[in-house]
């Protein structure tokens, strides 16, 4: 579920819709948490879908570390990509605000964290040499995302957390240890799931 202080807005014909903050969301706030309304789909099931449904599942879902497709039930499926994302993933089925998000600002993810099935060509952005999201970006950029997440967790206990009740019980003690600085975060490199595209590339070489 997305943070309640967000809304869906139309951007333009090229991008489509995006998710925007309606109020100030401070750094360290849970901006998304996986909950029991999200669909968890087996890749074999997705592969057997008709082409129309399969196309939409692959467009609006992401893959977890177990290769399962996570299809969010709410506006979370419309979060767009940025190489300077203001949301950062964790190993705990939630994302945090990587920095303060201002009212009217779009919430974004770096799609490199989402285990894409295929490379994803992006709109140009300043201050980055990246122009394409690759299925194995987690293997390249995990230290950067770990650092951002660790810094965000330092603010976790100092901000309001409307989605706190959605944290999975299996993660509660670990998150408590992180926020109390007794534990280090688990690296998001463990979110990585090898894609069929990468397997095909390996066979080509």
Residue positions per predicted region:
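Generic preference for flexible, low-structure residues
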Residues: 35, 41, 46-47, 95, ...
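Active-site-adjacent segment of 2-oxoglutarate/Fe(II) JmjC oxygenases
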Residues: 50-81, 134-164
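Catalytic core of the SET domain in histone-lysine N-methyltransferases
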Residues: 1-12, 51-124, 129
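Conserved AWS/pre-SET-to-SET junction and N-terminal core of the SET lysine methyltransferase domain
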Residues: 1-45, 81-92, 191-205
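Phenylalanine-focused residue identity feature
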Residues: 20, 24, 45, 62, ...
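Compositionally biased, intrinsically disordered low-complexity regions
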Residues: 18-20, 30, 69, 114, ...
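A sequence-composition feature that detects small, non-aromatic residues
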Residues: 21, 33, 76, 85, ...
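Non-catalytic accessory regions of eukaryotic chromatin regulators
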Residues: 1-4, 13, 114, 118-205
